[in-house]
Amino acid sequence: DVERLEKLEKAGRLTLLDGDVEDLFPGISVYSVGFGHSFDLQMVMVDTEKGKFLHTGDACNRPENLLGTESFPFYLPNTDFAVGPALNIVRGFDRILELVHGDVTHLIMTHDDTRRDLFPWHKSELGLSIFEIC
């Protein structure tokens, strides 16, 4: 809740990010992507032994949003659940591809069911899918 966040900030235990932050922690960077599914989205880049992977969060949920489909091989932004104009989402998609130098195999999308074929994974006790990308 907002009151708790205010208390944490006053106590010096909360740092608010504004824009891109390279090496927030060693090997972890945060990138702002603007509007999309919600306001002022952020993505996290993690440097692993297998290279850098970008978790797109809600900036791009599914591969077909970014890559299109066989019938429609172009960006398919989901504007039904978006904030702001579709152009902002398309610009965000451009940024995503720029950050991974076009290598979509280094993207982790929140609702990407194809990850099961790419990374080892297991179900947690709570029924969550845990993927190992390192």
Q: Residue locations for each model-derived region?
A:
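Pocket-edge structural micro-motifs
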Residues: 18, 32-34, 57-58, 111
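Residue-level detector of solvent-exposed, low-hydrophobicity positions
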Residues: 12-15, 44, 118, 126-128
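Active-site beta-strand termini and strand-to-loop segments that position acidic
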Residues: 35, 44-49
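Metallo-beta-lactamase
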Residues: 1-33, 81-104
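Cap/insert and terminal regions of metallo-dependent hydrolase folds
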Residues: 49-134
